[in-house]
């Protein structure tokens, strides 16, 4: 990745696609600007489970199209403590990732690994899991992350100031994941636009990715899409087949959507936390272990995806409530990660606290596939900023950043000065 490559990433469009207050995130409650954590605490204190949807329960009454929403014809339940959230995401037999009844034709025809469960989910996840294990982080860093990070810093280093939220934090995971699928820089924003149109951009997505699939079938390269193109999977009948184009497109859509849409907000959250705590910022600059701890603490303290849903496969009981089969159960990871029964001073950002498991990347069989890549992106990017930009600090003349959003949360900006 070079400076000339960066010039192909149109800045105005980049800002539009990653504006939490803009149209792209409107259906996810992007402009909801209340502090959601007092409401999370209030709800948890009166019981771990509440009938209803997280948004309205905390004061957000806008329309929302998100995983588990809207489903107006189904009962909804929301979970706010750590133990119950953890139990829900671990129990895939009772709380499914698919909206369809287990064993139904619709469930068996799911093309998205996110919506699969059980043995079928494990078979498909196993295909790409080796590319996302911790020891493969170096591959991602050397192939895409490191060059992207330094090319981006080159583009604004002489200015003495920058808004890191979009021109840095958003661009890194976008160019990393699209690069791993063989998508050129000029088309990276087209991919991002396609995967954020709630199904309306599928034609554009296929037009870009299908030719790459065909090219990799003829000649593999050292990238993620080649791994998918040449993977084989065993079906329910025990027959082995090479992944079809539709199966690859399903994988690609999920990985490109998630890979370009989550890490940037978490990186911004981590940076604003460190910039607001200068002692921790200095410690993170001097010690990579402190930076790793800071990233992990930001995932606990303010996860960018605070809510994820499951679907009850049978009549069950949860937190004292009868939950009918087909109900939507919203696991509120943001509330769970500040459960005072698990963490002392849960509202404080404290990278020095004892490390224990959190739900910043979800949990159970569907724990985030790309979590080690996300950690590598944040570690590499923030370390490079601290090394290359002397006296990095929040811009005193800019508006103070705020973390906003209902179902996807991130900072309004990360304005910095340096030098």
Feature locations, PLM:
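Cytochrome P450
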Residues: 1-419
């Amino acid at each position: 990745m070079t400076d000339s490559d960066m010039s192909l990433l149109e800045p105005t469009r980049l800002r539009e696609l990653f504006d939490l207050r803009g149209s792209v995130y409107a259906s996810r409650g992007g402009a909801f600007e209340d502090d959601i954590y007092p409401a999370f605490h209030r709800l948890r204190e009166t019981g771990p489970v509440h009938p209803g949807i997280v948004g309205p329960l905390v004061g957000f009454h806008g329309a929302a199209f998100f995983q588990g929403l809207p489903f107006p014809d189904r009962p909804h339940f929301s979970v706010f403590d750590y133990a119950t959230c953890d139990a829900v995401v671990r129990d895939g037999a009772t709380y499914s990732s698919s909206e369809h009844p287990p064993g139904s034709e619709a469930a068996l025809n799911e093309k998205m690994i996110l919506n699969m469960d059980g043995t079928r989910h494990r078979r498909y996840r196993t295909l790409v899991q080796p590319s996302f294990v911790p020891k493969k982080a170096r591959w991602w860093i050397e192939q895409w992350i490191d060059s992207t990070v330094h090319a981006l810093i080159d583009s604004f280093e002489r200015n003495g100031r920058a808004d890191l939220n979009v021109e840095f934090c958003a661009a890194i995971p976008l160019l990393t994941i699209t690069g791993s699928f063989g998508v050129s820089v000029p088309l990276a924003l087209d991919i991002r636009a396609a995967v954020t149109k709630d199904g309306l951009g599928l034609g554009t997505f296929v037009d870009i990715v299908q030719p790459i699939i065909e090219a990799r079938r003829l000649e593999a390269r050292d990238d993620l899409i080649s791994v998918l193109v040449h993977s084989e999977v065993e079906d329910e009948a025990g027959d082995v087949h090479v992944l079809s184009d539709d199966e690859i497109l399903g994988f690609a859509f999920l990985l490109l959507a998630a890979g370009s849409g989550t890490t940037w907000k978490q990186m911004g959250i981590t940076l604003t936390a460190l910039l607001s705590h200068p002692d921790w910022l200095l410690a993170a600059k001097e010690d990579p272990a402190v930076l790793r701890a800071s990233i992990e603490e930001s995932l606990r303290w303010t996860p960018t995806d605070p809510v994820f849903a499951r679907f009850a496969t049978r009549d069950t009981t949860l937190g004292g409530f009868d939950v009918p089969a087909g109900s939507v159960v919203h696991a509120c990871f943001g509330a769970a990660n500040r459960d005072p029964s698990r963490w002392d001073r849960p509202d404080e950002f404290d990278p020095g606290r004892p490390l224990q498991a959190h739900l910043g990347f979800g949990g159970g069989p569907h724990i985030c596939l790309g979590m080690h890549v996300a950690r590598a992106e944040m570690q590499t990017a923030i370390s490079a900023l601290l090394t290359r930009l002397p006296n990095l600090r929040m811009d005193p003349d800019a508006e103070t950043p705020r973390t906003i959003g209902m179902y996807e949360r991130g900072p309004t900006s990360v304005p910095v000065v340096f030098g």
